[in-house]
Amino acid sequence: AGYVLNLMDDFYSSIEMPEGTSVSLEALYHSAEGSPSHIMNFIGPVDGLIALRALRSGDAYDAYNTGVEKFATILSIKAGKTLARIPGTDENVFGAQEWSFNVKDQVKFGAAFVELMKVFKPTGYVSLGQYTHGEKGETHYIYSMYNDQAAMLNFGPKTEAEISAFNKFFSKTSAISEYNGSRTTVPVKTWN
């Protein structure tokens, strides 16, 4: 990972990132041997991401990409957009978690999420998003950031009201969605 990090640092530090965009390298928290170990995230507004894609060309990019391909393999490509973001801090991020779903009724699922978040108060920010393309038919995700390991390990309902809100969310969404699993990441470096 160190070699790839150096290649990424050399390339992404040498270009002027478009307004509002960032690229980050994240490590999967406790990935199994032989499974993906890192994720590259490209974040920003659509126009910024299109401009960033245009910058990813030329001799410098070709050299970077050739170097990365010696040590890394693309196993999946996903894209999505935030539908609802619950305010919270996204500074000093220790880690993040993404829960993936196949949703049959996005209006009901979204309403259940908003209802849950009126009661549940996490320390970091939480968002509901929609995959615009993925790999296994997943349609939506819930994404949460944590400012330290304790917040990540203690995530979940803390009060009777929060427990009740989670139970309502699961009872309202279980018939209209299928949970695909989750992944937890920790940041390695971000360029913006």
Predicted features and spans:
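Short S/T/G/P-rich N-terminal loop/turn motif that feeds into the first structured element of a domain
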Residues: 1-192
